[in-house]
Amino acid sequence: MSDYLFTSESVGEGHPDKVADQISDAILDAILAQDKHSRVAAETLCNTGLVVLAGEITTNANVDYIQVARDTIKRIGYDNTEYGIDYKGCAVLVAYDKQSPDIAQGVNAAYDDNLGQGAGDQGLMFGYACDETPSLMPLPIYLSHRMVERQAMLRKDGRLPWARPDAKSQVTIRYVDGKPHSIDTVVLSTQHSPDISLEDLREATIEQIIKPVLPKELIKGDIKYLVNPTGRFVVGGPQGDCGLTGRKIIVDTYGGAAPHGGGAFSGKDPSKVDRSAAYATRYVAKNIVAAGLASRCLVQVSYAIGVAEPTSIMVETYGTGKVSNETLTALVRKHFDLRPKGIVNMLDLLRPIYQKTAAYGHFGRDEPEFTWEATDRANLLKSDAGL
């Protein structure tokens, strides 16, 4: 019998790195709403009273980037100078260039393929699914997301008036024989106004944010609750730490339960396989698990810049597969078009759908825009595998 602990974390929408991610994706959406064939690599830095927008954008869209940034900061809840950044008074600097023509020539017309679009860069991407939750996500990251999501909901609807936008969560699960057995430790830190006592904050956080999220069947024995362990968290958000786009790539994916190729998502249009192929491999892995062909599935793809066909495709099922990994890889090649433009068409990615992805995870959420979460090819895979 194997017995081990595994931990994942998430951060709230007011975390400085997530503020940057959301601004980058809000700008991407504003551009795609006007010109869906734009090339966008929008990076954001946010600090006390300051937002810097930089990167490469080639578009026919006419977007007020400064207003988009301010609107995003307002929606998150930074609407008071006491919070260190406020949407009305912060400085916003814009420094976008156009996409390099050397990159564009390989993306616009792949040398190996008449589908017309090569990969925007080399790289490797992973997708993962497992049967630990109904959304086929690992349990620790799933619970971590739900906690910071609930913190934001209770903050915005007035039930926790002392709560401020920045927050972090972390969940440790005990696994027995590879399956979740019980919840061991929950860490939650939430920014707060200076006038609430630590005792009241901890009680409200445990009772109103944490406990409603925990699956009752996994509450066995005493759970260790660590709420605001430093004792005070008034200074937070971009004032507490400088935020940058793309620094929460494990939060964005599987919480460390699966490998990561290293490429961030936010601010990138779908010609960037860092984003689109990570979505596609999640779609593939989720359909394999939904089909009952494995209880855990990892899919890797890789690309060369300017080349449409993936340089490799791999499926790994960790001994849980009903058919061989080689058979599954062949099924993936047969039923999923993993060329960059094939992915865009398969998942309908040329839409302004990305700001919603930029907090609480890109995967495992039941949102109508998240086409990569559909399991519409599970029956096809199952029948073709002969099961």
UniProtKB/Swiss-Prot annotation:
Disulfide bonds: none annotated. Keywords: ATP-binding, Cytoplasm, Magnesium, Metal-binding, Nucleotide-binding, One-carbon metabolism, Potassium, Transferase. The keyword ATP-binding applies. GO terms for cellular component: cytoplasm. Its cofactor is Mg(2+); K(+). One of its GO terms (molecular function) is methionine adenosyltransferase activity. Binds 2 divalent ions per subunit. Binds 1 potassium ion per subunit. It catalyses: L-methionine + ATP + H2O = S-adenosyl-L-methionine + phosphate + diphosphate. Residues 99-109 are annotated as: Flexible loop. It comes from the Bacteria. Its main location: cytoplasm. K(+) binds at E43. Mg(2+) binds at D17. Its EC number is 2.5.1.6. L-methionine binds at E56, Q99, D241, K272. Belongs to the AdoMet synthase family. NCBIfam families: metK (TIGR01034). HAMAP family: S_AdoMet_synth1 (MF_00086). Homotetramer; dimer of dimers. This is S-adenosylmethionine synthase. The lineage of its organism: Bacteria, Pseudomonadati, Pseudomonadota, Betaproteobacteria, Rhodocyclales.
